[in-house]
Amino acid sequence: MKGRNWNQASVAKLFELPFFELLYKAYETHRSHFDVRDMELCTLSSIKTGTCPEDCAYCPQSGHYKTDVEREKLINLEAVLEQAKVAKENGARRFCMGAAWRSPPKRELPKVLEMIKSVKALGLETCVTLGMLDQEQALQLKEAGLDFYNHNLDTSPEFYKKIITTRTYQDRMETLKNVRNAGINVCCGGILGMGESRADRIQLLLELYQLPEPPTSIPINQLIPIKGTPLENTKAIDPFEFIKTIAITRLLFPTSVIRLSAGREAMSDELQAWCFMAGANSIFYGDKLLTAKNPGQNRDVNLLKKLGLKVPVLTEEYACY
């Protein structure tokens, strides 16, 4: 389906396909471009937590809401390296660092640049998510050796206005442009289950599809309703709708890595297995996802074994029991 001129109507038709027919098409596409036994493992660390000035309705790190998140200033290089070493020992391929900023403060960015250089020296791929970037900041990250920059669109432009008011959709597009122009791989996806419609989910995929280049990796998050945020009582997305969205993401983006991201802690092994068959071929690996719970490494390893996928070897020192 590469090169297809997708629009709302044509993507909507995919959603109307019988479930197994849609998954069959997605799995065929996946097999054509990837080793179906391979699962890309990434670890995500919160290097600066809380007091974010943005008002993203889903986020417990926003300074606008009273949540249980403990505020923490930018952690030091030694702490980052210790986490990265543990991640590598346990089979992670990429180490991602997230900071709750609107954009990286001038006084803090040099510290992050040093983190990138040091983590890469361990033999890991690097990814950061630091908020909005101007062109100069993106070039500095590239010079430090950054491999990926994560900046999600979150949802459709229409629904976005109900979720965030402190940063525009165009602000996000501008950051993605600066990242691309700097020669950094783009990691960009969204969040499902915030109360959006199917049309919103379709439009999110079309916004990603219409970027000058497809994102190298596409994280698909399921909302984790956090107490104290405006979305704490939001009804969960239907599991079949979630799986279908992943399958359609695979059809629109045959060569992108699709990461099953936030929300896995609440997913059954069976639901995750369906997501993998639909085309998801990456997970965040480790018992924490920024400030949210994530399945323990043993649970993930056991699931990968059950499914006959490639399994990392846990060291006895770092295994999670």
From Swiss-Prot:
Designated name of the protein: Biotin synthase
Q: Where does [2Fe-2S] cluster bind?
A: C96, C127, C187, R259
- Which residues hold [4Fe-4S] cluster? C52, C56, C59
Q: Supply the enzyme class, top level.
A: transferase
Q: Which organism is it from?
A: Coxiella burnetii (strain RSA 493 / Nine Mile phase I)
Give the function comment from the record. Catalyzes the conversion of dethiobiotin (DTB) to biotin by the insertion of a sulfur atom into dethiobiotin via a radical-based mechanism.
- Which UniProt keywords are present, listed alphabetically? 2Fe-2S, 4Fe-4S, Biotin biosynthesis, Iron, Iron-sulfur, Metal-binding, S-adenosyl-L-methionine, Transferase
InterPro entries associated with the record: Aldolase_TIM, BATS_dom, Biotin_synth/BioAB, Biotin_synthase, Elp3/MiaA/NifB-like_rSAM, rSAM
Give the EC number(s) listed in the UniProt record: 2.8.1.6
Annotated cofactor note: Binds 1 [4Fe-4S] cluster. The cluster is coordinated with 3 cysteines and an exchangeable S-adenosyl-L-methionine.
Give start and end of each Radical SAM core domain.
37-264
Q: Name one GO biological process term.
A: biotin biosynthetic process
Q: Drop me one GO molecular function for this one.
A: 2 iron, 2 sulfur cluster binding
Q: In which pathway does it act?
A: Cofactor biosynthesis; biotin biosynthesis; biotin from 7,8-diaminononanoate: step 2/2
- Reactions it catalyzes: (4R,5S)-dethiobiotin + (sulfur carrier)-SH + 2 reduced [2Fe-2S]-[ferredoxin] + 2 S-adenosyl-L-methionine = (sulfur carrier)-H + biotin + 2 5'-deoxyadenosine + 2 L-methionine + 2 oxidized [2Fe-2S]-[ferredoxin]
